[in-house]
From Swiss-Prot:
Phylogenetic lineage: Bacteria, Bacillati, Actinomycetota, Actinomycetes, Mycobacteriales
Encoding gene (name): pgk
A biological-process GO annotation: glycolytic process
Source organism of the structure: Corynebacterium glutamicum (strain ATCC 13032 / DSM 20300 / JCM 1318 / BCRC 11384 / CCUG 27702 / LMG 3730 / NBRC 12168 / NCIMB 10025 / NRRL B-2784 / 534)
Protein name per Swiss-Prot or TrEMBL: Phosphoglycerate kinase
Signal peptide annotation: none
Main location: cytoplasm
GO molecular function: ADP binding; ATP binding; phosphoglycerate kinase activity
Record: residues binding substrate: 24-26, 40, 63-66, 122, 162
Length: 405
């Protein structure tokens, strides 16, 4: 990827310069607005530290949730500013707005090494506008915060697949660089997209088949096996004629699954047993059942132990592994064993078979942390779920493509 990097910017010198950084702080919060997974914040620290230590006046942009272009306290970045201050060991101020009076005053008042976090960029409807003129106007207002001799660093890999103002349009207005996180993510994904060592095993979970069709099509030619679990497996099982009862089912995708099984049946590996639940509840009654024995009115919320064993055997011989999506409702302890078992099998293959393993962001990355698994047991945990999938599908990522211009 022929783009300028953070190292190039630091070599040019940042002392006294305003540097605007797009980070990805779209982190999960509980009802008390406490961050439940700091993974994305931790991943952003090296770039922010390097710029601060280089004497830059750092202005950070990010979004949280979907406030739909309106100021909404529920989506304020206040918890993020607090977490950044704790993790960096220095005060990170939060502007009261995005490009308003407070943001300008604070940006103008920065001294070398200071870090300012702008309020949620999605509080401004122009951030996600389909109208290029609106996005350009917003980008100009953001770029103005950098004054003369400013620079833009793209370090939010989880958003580079979106052509939005703070990711894409601003890069047209300032000298632009890939942050350390974006650079690492792209190099890892290039490795598995272009030259994966065989056997290459892809593990797909998550709720919707429709979200993963593109990646199955794209990877079927390269992968030796595609393991399918999670909510999406029930549409495949239904396509094979199994009665999945009240399990998550995309009826309109059954024909597509039938077609995929006809073409890639030798590669697609499905569960052989399930963990059925009486209702969608962490305290639901549960049973381990074979594929046609889900009690009437019940639903499956996880893959069963035989499936974990089968999938583990496939993974044990792999040299390259890409995992995106949990195997079940891991947030409920009673239905987390499938995800835990697969994650552990990937960790074991990484250590025992020297496999190159990538966790493709999103819920799979969250599950590793929620279940207390060893994050260092994987070769790489991506911060971008949708972005990593789109990259592997062969789609252009606007936020990366613009950096090459």
């Amino acid at each position: 990827m022929a783009v300028k990097t953070l190292k190039d910017l630091l070599d040019e010198g940042v002392d006294g310069r305003h540097v605007i950084v797009r980070s990805d702080f779209n982190v999960p919060l509980n009802d008390d607005r406490e961050i439940t997974d700091k993974g994305r914040i931790i991943a952003s620290l090296p770039t922010l530290k390097a710029l601060s230590e280089g004497g830059a006046k750092v202005i950070v942009m990010a979004h949280l949730g979907r406030p739909k272009g309106e100021v909404n306290e529920k989506y304020s970045l206040a918890p993020v500013a607090e977490a950044l201050s704790d993790e960096l060991g220095q005060y990170v101020a939060l502007a009261a707005d995005v490009v308003g009076e407070d943001a300008h005053e604070r940006a103008n008042g920065l001294t070398e090494g200071d870090i300012l976090l702008l309020e949620n960029v999605r509080f401004d409807p122009r951030e996600t506008s389909k109208d290029e003129a609106e996005r350009t106007a917003f980008a100009q207002e953001l770029a103005a915060l950098a004054a003369d001799n400013g620079a833009f660093v793209s370090d939010g890999f989880g958003v580079v697949h979106r052509a939005q103002t703070s990711v894409y349009d601003i890069a047209k207005l300032l000298p632009h660089y890939a942050g350390g996180l974006v650079e690492t993510e792209i190099s890892v994904l290039e490795k598995i997209a272009e030259s994966p060592e065989a056997p290459y095993v892809v593990v797909l979970g998550g709720s919707k088949v429709s979200d993963k069709i593109g990646v199955i099509e794209a990877l079927a030619a390269k992968a030796d096996k595609i393991i399918v679990g999670g909510g999406m497996c029930y549409t495949f099982l239904a396509a094979q004629g199994h009665n999945v009862q009240q399990s998550l089912l995309q009826e309109e995708m059954k024909a597509t699954c039938t077609d995929l099984l006809a073409r890639f049946g030798d590669k697609i590996v499905l569960p052989v047993d399930l963990v059925a639940a009486s209702e969608f509840n962490k305290d639901a009654e549960k049973q381990i059942v074979d594929l046609d024995s889900i009690p009437e009115g019940w639903m499956s919320l996880d893959i069963g132990p035989e499936s974990v064993k089968n999938f583990g055997e496939v993974l044990s011989t792999a040299k390259t592994i890409f995992w995106n999506g949990p195997m079940g409702v891991f947030e409920f302890a009673a239905f987390s064993e499938g995800t835990r078992g697969i994650a552990q099998a990937i960790i074991d293959a990484t250590a025992g078979n020297d496999a190159f393993s990538v966790v493709g962001g999103g819920d799979s990355a969250a599950s590793v942390r929620v279940l207390g698994l060893n994050e260092d047991g994987f070769s790489h945990i991506s911060t971008g779920g949708g972005a990593s999938l789109e990259y592997l599908e062969g789609k252009e990522l606007p936020g990366v493509a613009i950096l090459a211009q």
